[in-house]
Amino acid sequence: MFKSSICNNKLNIEEIKEKGDLPTTQEELRQRRERAETLVKKKSLLSSGASIVPIPGLDFGVDLKLMRDIIEDVNKIYGLDHDQVNSLSDQVKERIMSAAAIQGSQFIGRKVSEALLKVVIKDVAKRAAAKQTKWFPFVGQAVSASISYYFMSKLGKDHINKCEKVINNL
């Protein structure tokens, strides 16, 4: 936690504490997208940095935490986190969950830990081969860092797109 806060301070990563209301205008949606994309870029850089450290397993543990953080923070930015969705009327909650199911998102309006394992298992299989490049000094670490950044960024951008589709379908 201490190291995480140091990295967050160095990269000036915004800590998402408040839970926003559902966006109602396209301008509001655009602002939230910018905020979410900035967060995803910075968290992806952290993932990339952890990949450079030649300690087996460190990058995997950091990636798990960052995946969870990205998904939870993006949900909060869009007003689609678990607690907020559950506080809405049953009709709105049902519409959000239906729209999320149509988008194929297991993360919107739910606790992240349940669905995260399914995604992580699929993601780890893809990364495992790429991470083996660490055994080739310097070049392997650079390749590993690039792959880590790409996958973390893709996960975040895909989740942002799904959140926006859910909002637009309400």
Where are these regions (language model features)?
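Terminal, membrane-proximal amphipathic helices
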Residues: 1-50, 64-170
